[in-house]
């Protein structure tokens, strides 16, 4: 069902809408992962502040989803081990750890903003295609009623 020379078929529009829907879903999953990373960094910074304040007890999540907490006592120290990326970790003083975490958070926030921009473009294109498909469907329904 071609719309003329150089036109695009209805099947092409449907395939493009399907592709964009899957792409949008993928972007949304990635966006969620980035937001979870930002939240984890904020939690790590709060833990460092707790250590810096001299508080000797803290609640620590045992699992990633927060189903289990443990009260840990005897937390003292002036150094922590921080993730640098890939498989690299470093033991650094508390202030350096906060600087590293702040830098990482900035990087992730920029990536999240870029991803959000891409998500908005993809959603806009998807909505335009859906509008076109709805117009085609309405025109076909009117033609059928007119027969």
Swiss-Prot record:
Please indicate if the UniProt record lists Repressor as a keyword: no
Kindly give the InterPro entries that the UniProt entry links to this protein: PFD_alpha_archaea (IPR011599), Prefoldin (IPR009053), Prefoldin_subunit_alpha (IPR004127)
Gene3D superfamilies to which the protein is assigned, alphabetical? 1.10.287.370
Subcellular compartments: Cytoplasm
Q: What is its main location?
A: cytoplasm
Q: GO annotations under biological process?
A: protein folding
* Entry GO CC: cytoplasm; prefoldin complex
User: Which Pfam families did the record assign?
Assistant: Prefoldin
Top-level taxon of origin? Archaea
In its UniProt record, a GO molecular function of this protein is: unfolded protein binding
Q: What are the protein's UniProt keywords?
A: Chaperone, Cytoplasm
| Quaternary assembly | Heterohexamer of two alpha and four beta subunits.
Cited PANTHER family: PREFOLDIN SUBUNIT 5
Classification via NCBIfam families: prefoldin subunit alpha (TIGR00293)
Described purpose of this protein according to its UniProt entry? Molecular chaperone capable of stabilizing a range of proteins. Seems to fulfill an ATP-independent, HSP70-like function in archaeal de novo protein folding.
* Record family assignment: Belongs to the prefoldin alpha subunit family.
Which HAMAP family does the annotation name? PfdA
- Protein name per Swiss-Prot or TrEMBL: Prefoldin subunit alpha
What is the scientific name of the source organism? Saccharolobus islandicus (strain Y.N.15.51 / Yellowstone #2) (Sulfolobus islandicus)
Tell me the organism's taxonomic lineage: Archaea, Thermoproteota, Thermoprotei, Sulfolobales, Sulfolobaceae
